[in-house]
């Protein structure tokens, strides 16, 4: 509400701000966007702006901060990335022509889910706005990336499914129509997801009808309508690039919860939350941003159809076999900009001339790609090329209209080529002739007045002028020159002739600039008609980029094409490798392992020391399955796999910070998910189930879970455990086999073999692993003593508290009486490598050890 005794401009500000109380209002004043009141105070702090005040002479000056209009995107992005909303209030008329107060209005509400201007490092990330409708039968869910227009919808039975989709999509904003429980609110808050209210839009909108035209499920239709309505309300313009919503069932793809994707580090490293170290990092050698985004979506949604997988494999094989064609395609792809987002900006009306040329250059690369594919003898590559329309007409239209190096702004001229418009060419002739006259006038005035340094200049305030230095102003002909401006070292004048030509030149410039902008808008609207064709082309190019990328990665890393068994669940991976781990190890040092599970083997019970590679082996199997089902080749000598419908994991020992569950509760929840939903066609990875609780509880639960998986589920399961007692289960469970990760002891030191061997491990080597971790020698000695006592009395014969062994009993006397410091010196002596030491260095080491022992006496 407007304050009393305020100016008309501030009254206008308060009226607009009242409509957007939860958003930062960027209010356009001249060349700046201003923030006022609380927006200014908070915005100055977040954006590191200088906080000033308006109406300083009043009792209550108004806090104010501003940003240049040319840099506004940077500041807006900063706020939106932090979860805030920004309302852009623009001047709706030319201030010079306005009668009274300049009209202003909101041209766009930018929210976390509708941000269009991504940073360069976000080019391969999607930004999904999600809409959720609560119904009697469950939930309708729809989502769209405004920058590309792609739109999807599905329906889910419970909020747990909704939460999983939101996390998997990494959505930053959800439009939600139903009642949220406190638990759901807490989840959304911890997940940093902004919750927005639905909005109603008046009248019929073509976008809503177009996007929902293929949907049949009522919940999906409502969710999609709610999504598009919100976009129309916030963006306040035509959204012609929104694509027809694609309905999907989660069961259409290999299902993996967000937790599974995180555990397997498909898109980000679990430790750093960065791309590096993930499967996406390994596989992403794509040449285009849209190819990178498509690759990410393929990794998150592997296929179930052998036919579709084979189609991708055939393309990968063809590109792998033809190195020169592949390299030519890659070179051409490097010249393709982000067609999807360029198309979005064209529809949005925010594209500039340089981006329009980027579109043309991208289209210019398509014929080279097609020629490379058509020149091969491979029918798969040829058929792919024949389906692509290069849209040559659009390319020619743009390059024949826009100059080679246009300015960034579309409102200051210099955009349009000569010959495009006769009227524009006439304006330019007038401008050129006028400027030629100015040059001739400058020469003439120098000659007439004798002022050799006289010059004709221009600025936006005073227009054209004649500048004369103070040392020559006595030579100025006062009968023709009228003083216009006084400077420190010069005077500026005008003449009647100069004023007359100024009007002609400026009028031509203004009309030329205006006409150029009109011609650019006309070009943009013409290209806009081809948005569906451009979007189709973008998808085809992105797909080719990913498949070419698969061929390159497969060749570089010696991957093999996997085969699939449709009628039986058998795994036969020979010398499989963890695709990511092998890349960060020294070349040739990775130890490959087989995974062979026939019809009669459902469960591998894996034992072996910690740090020996059990978890790597399990993840390796899952990643090979995922790579196979996205159409990529896999890290192995050979691989025959079933088509998995779901993957379940229980890997890692971290609390679930979003749901607030403890480690053990997370263990049980993830285990229950697998027990409830896994089928015979699923892959289950359980690592150290039961470690989050007491020993006997954990062992009992782990054993019961193994038995249930064996008797009731029948899924292919890799079950790693430190409970060696469970290895006896192979006596009663006929589909369970024991395997272990090999290790050996040399000179009292543990050597990991990293090789999977048949049968159970004979010991756990826990104290040796603790030694590798650097635990104090005293702790290790006491642990060794305690272990010997326990082994003597029997692993299962734990005594009552009153009879428990004292860690410091007389038996410890059998341990040599040596201090920790002495042990440190002995370790140094044992570990020193004398071959790379000079005699002098050896003498220095001996002296150092002697001194250390003396100091401890």
Curated annotation (Swiss-Prot):
Domain of life: Bacteria
GO cellular component, one term: cytosol
CDD domains xrefs: ABC_MutS1
Any one Gene Ontology BP term: mismatch repair
Pfam families: MutS_I, MutS_II, MutS_III, MutS_IV, MutS_V
Binding residues annotated for ATP, in chain numbering: 608-615
UniProt keyword list: ATP-binding, DNA damage, DNA repair, DNA-binding, Nucleotide-binding
Record InterPro entries: DNA_mismatch_repair_MutS, DNA_mismatch_repair_MutS-lik_N, DNA_mismatch_repair_MutS/MSH, DNA_mismatch_repair_MutS_C, DNA_mismatch_repair_MutS_clamp, DNA_mismatch_repair_MutS_core, DNA_mismatch_repair_MutS_N, DNA_mismatch_repair_MutS_sf
PROSITE patterns: DNA_MISMATCH_REPAIR_2 (PS00486)
The keyword DNA repair belongs to this UniProt entry's keyword annotation: yes
GO molecular function: ATP binding; ATP-dependent DNA damage sensor activity; damaged DNA binding; mismatched DNA binding
Family: Belongs to the DNA mismatch repair MutS family.
Known function: This protein is involved in the repair of mismatches in DNA. It is possible that it carries out the mismatch recognition step. This protein has a weak ATPase activity.
Name under which the protein is recorded: DNA mismatch repair protein MutS
Organism: Lactobacillus gasseri (strain ATCC 33323 / DSM 20243 / BCRC 14619 / CIP 102991 / JCM 1131 / KCTC 3163 / NCIMB 11718 / NCTC 13722 / AM63)
């Amino acid at each position: 509400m407007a304050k009393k005794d305020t100016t008309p401009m501030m009254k206008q500000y308060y009226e607009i701000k009242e409509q957007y109380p939860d958003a930062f209002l960027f209010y356009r004043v001249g060349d700046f966007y201003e923030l006022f009141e609380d927006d200014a105070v908070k915005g100055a702090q977040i954006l590191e702006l200088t906080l000033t005040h308006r109406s300083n002479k009043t009792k209550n000056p108004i806090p104010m901060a501003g940003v240049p209009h040319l840099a506004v995107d940077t500041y807006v992005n900063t706020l939106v990335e932090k979860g805030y909303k920004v309302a852009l209030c623009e001047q709706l008329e030319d201030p010079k022509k306005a009668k009274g107060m300049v009209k202003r209005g909101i041209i766009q509400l930018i929210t976390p889910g509708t941000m269009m201007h991504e940073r360069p490092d976000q080019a391969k990330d999607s930004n999904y706005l999600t809409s959720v409708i609560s119904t009697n039968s469950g939930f309708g869910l729809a989502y769209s990336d405004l920058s590309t227009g792609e739109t999807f919808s599905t329906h889910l039975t419970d909020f747990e499914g909704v939460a999983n989709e939101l996390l998997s999509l990494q959505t930053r904003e959800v439009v939600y129509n139903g009642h949220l429980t406190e638990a759901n609110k807490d989840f959304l808050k911890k997940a940093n997801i902004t919750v927005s209210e639905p909005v109603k839009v008046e009248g019929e909108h073509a976008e809503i009808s177009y996007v929902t035209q293929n949907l049949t499920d009522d919940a999906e239709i409502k969710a999609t309508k709610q999504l598009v309505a919100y976009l129309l309300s916030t963006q306040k313009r035509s959204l012609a690039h929104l694509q027809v919503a694609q309905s999907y069932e989660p069961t259409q793809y290999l299902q993996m919860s967000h937790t599974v994707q995180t555990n397997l580090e498909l898109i980000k490293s679990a430790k750093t939350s960065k791309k590096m170290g993930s499967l996406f990092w390994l596989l992403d050698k794509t040449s285009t941003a849209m190819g990178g985004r498509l690759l990410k979506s393929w990794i998150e949604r592997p296929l179930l159809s052998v036919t579709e997988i084979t189609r991708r494999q055939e393309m990968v094989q063809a590109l792998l076999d033809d190195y020169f064609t592949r390299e030519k395609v890659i070179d051409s792809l490097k010249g393709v900009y982000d067609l999807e987002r360029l198309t979005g900006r064209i529809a949005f009306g925010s594209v500039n001339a340089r981006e329009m040329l980027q579109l043309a250059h991208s289209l210019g690369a398509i014929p080279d790609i097609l020629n490379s594919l058509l020149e091969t003898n491979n029918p798969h590559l040829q058929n792919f090329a024949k389906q692509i329309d290069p849209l040559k007409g659009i390319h020619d239209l743009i390059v024949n209209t826009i100059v080679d190096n246009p300015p960034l702004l579309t409102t200051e001229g210099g955009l349009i080529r000569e010959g495009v418009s006769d009227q524009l060419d006439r304006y330019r002739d007038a401008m050129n002739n006028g400027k030629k006259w100015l040059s001739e006038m400058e020469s003439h005035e120098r000659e007439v007045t004798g002022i050799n340094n006289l010059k004709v200049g221009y600025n936006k305030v005073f227009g054209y002028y004649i500048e004369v230095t103070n040392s020559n102003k006595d030579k100025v002909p006062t009968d023709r020159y009228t003083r216009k401006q006084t400077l420190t070292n010069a005077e500026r004048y005008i003449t009647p002739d100069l004023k007359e030509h100024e009007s002609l030149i400026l009028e031509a410039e203004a009309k030329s600039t205006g006409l150029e902008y009109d011609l650019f808008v006309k070009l943009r609207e013409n290209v806009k008609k081809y948005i569906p064709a451009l979007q189709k082309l973008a998808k085809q190019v992105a797909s080719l980029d990913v498949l070419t990328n698969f061929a390159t990665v497969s060749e570089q890393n010696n991957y093999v094409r996997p085969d699939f068994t449709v009628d039986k669940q058998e795994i036969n991976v020979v010398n499989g490798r963890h695709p990511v781990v092998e890349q960060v190890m020294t070349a040739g040092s990775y130890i490959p392992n087989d995974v062979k599970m026939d019809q009669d083997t459902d469960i591998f019970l894996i034992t072996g020391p910690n740090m020996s590679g059990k978890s790597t082996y399990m993840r390796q199997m899952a990643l090979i399955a995922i790579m196979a089902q996205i159409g990529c080749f896999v890290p192995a000598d050979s691989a025959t796999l079933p088509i998995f419908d779901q993957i379940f994991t229980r890997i890692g020992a971290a609390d679930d910070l979003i749901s607030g569950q403890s480690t053990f509760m997370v263990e049980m929840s993830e285990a229950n998910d697998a027990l409830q939903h896994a089928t015979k066609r699923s892959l289950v990875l359980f690592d150290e189930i039961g470690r989050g609780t007491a020993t006997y509880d954990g062992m009992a639960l782990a054993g019961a879970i193994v038995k249930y998986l064996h008797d009731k589920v029948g899924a292919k399961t890799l079950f790693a455990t430190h409970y060696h007692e469970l290895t006896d289960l192979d006596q009663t469970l006929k589909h369970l086999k024991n395997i272990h990760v090999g290790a050996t002891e040399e000179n009292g030191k543990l050597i990991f073999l990293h090789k999977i061997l048949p049968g159970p491990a004979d010991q756990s080597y826990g104290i040796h692993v603790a030694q590798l971790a650097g635990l104090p020698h005293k702790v290790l000695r006491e642990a060794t003593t305690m272990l010997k006592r326990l082994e003597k009395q029997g692993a299962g014969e734990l005594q009552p508290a009153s009879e428990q062994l004292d860690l410091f009993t007389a038996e410890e006397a059998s341990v040599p009486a040596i201090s920790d410091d002495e042990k440190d010196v002995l370790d140094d002596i044992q570990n020193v490598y004398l071959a790379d030491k000079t005699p002098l260095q050896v003498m220095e080491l001996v002296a150092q050890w002697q001194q250390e022992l003396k100091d401890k006496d």
